[in-house]
Swiss-Prot record:
Belongs to the herpesviridae UL24 family. Coiled coil: none annotated. It holds the Pfam family Herpes_UL24. It comes from Varicella-zoster virus (strain Dumas) (HHV-3). Keywords: Host cytoplasm, Host Golgi apparatus, Host nucleus, Late protein, Virion. May participate in nuclear egress of viral particles. Plays a role in the dispersal of several host nucleolar proteins including NCL/nucleolin and NPM1. Since deletion of host NCL/nucleolin negatively impact on nuclear egress, UL24 supposedly acts on this process through its effect on host nucleoli. This is Protein UL24 homolog. It is found in: Virion; Host cytoplasm; Host nucleus, Host nucleolus; Host Golgi apparatus. GO terms for cellular component: host cell Golgi apparatus; host cell nucleolus; virion component. Its main location: virion. InterPro entries: Herpes_UL24. Induction: Expressed late in the infection cycle.
């Protein structure tokens, strides 16, 4: 295969990874809007909260735009989240540059270093452009740029880097409207038929999981009775804690120790 065809293939794979990531992030945001806090995708919950001390599950306003055309730059995603905490509102504007990785075993390679440097330049330019284009107003907005490395297979978050946030003042509503108007990608809305098919699939998976859990429980009881008859003391099992929250509460684990 020629070098040009390899580059074209890599470009297509990267594009596909971007759109899949957008779709998952959009579903997360939609779940927040509908009040389904427990319906987060576990990968997305790490992305925003720990970097800004904003609880996205308590957002009063969320605006998200993809492939935003700002002229010199086109950030992959710009997300504006407004929350209320103890009566005081807080607004964060996240700029997300996404870098997809075909091979995720080693994040420290020349190719990924080039992607990192390119992403940093893109974020700095985008911050300046957003500051220039923000309509005049009194709203305080904290602009937070994020460089996100994600694996093409599985959409696993590999590394998230945040540039120092900057506070700007402007009209929040007009800024969100402007960004939505210049966005060049909108995640597709699933048809009713497709939603029903996915719902049936989820119900089927849940029923299988319940049957499997019952089967495991029965076998565990049988094993316990056998060991008890032999006079064996079994250790108590602590219930496992499921991941609560989801790519909006996972860019948390990466920064919770920092």
């Amino acid at each position: 295969m020629s070098a040009s065809r390899i580059r074209a293939k890599c470009f297509r794979l990267g594009q596909r990874c971007h759109t899949r990531f957008y779709d998952v992030l959009k579903k997360d945001i939609d779940n927040v809007r509908r009040g389904f806090a427990d319906a987060f995708n576990p990968r997305l919950a790490k992305l925003l909260s720990p970097l800004s001390h904003v609880d996205v599950q308590r957002a009063v306003r969320i605006s998200m735009s993809f492939e935003v055309n700002l002229g010199r730059r086109r950030p992959d995603c710009v997300c504006i989240i407004q929350t209320e905490s103890s009566g005081a509102g807080k607004t964060v504007c996240f700029i997300v540059e996404l870098k997809s990785c075909r091979f995720s075993a080693n994040i420290h390679t020349p190719t990924k270093y080039h992607q990192f440097c390119e992403g940093m330049r893109q974020l700095r330019d985008t911050m300046a452009l957003i500051k220039e284009t923000t309509p005049t107003g009194s709203d305080e907005i904290m602009v937070t740029p994020l460089l996100v490395f994600v694996s093409q297979r599985g959409l696993n978050l590999l590394q998230v880097t945040r540039l120092p946030p900057k506070v700007i003042h402007g009209n929040l509503v007009m800024l969100a409207s402007h960004l939505e108007n210049v966005a060049e990608y909108t995640p597709p809305i699933r048809s009713v038929r497709e939603r029903r098919r996915l719902c049936k699939k989820k119900i089927h998976v849940c029923s299988l999981a319940k049957k499997r859990a019952k089967s495991c429980h029965r076998s565990a009881l049988t094993k316990f009775e056998e060991n008890a008859a032999c006079g064996v003391d079994l250790p108590l099992r602590r219930p496992s804690l499921g991941a609560c929250g989801g790519i909006l509460q996972s860019i948390t684990g990466m920064f919770s120790h920092g």
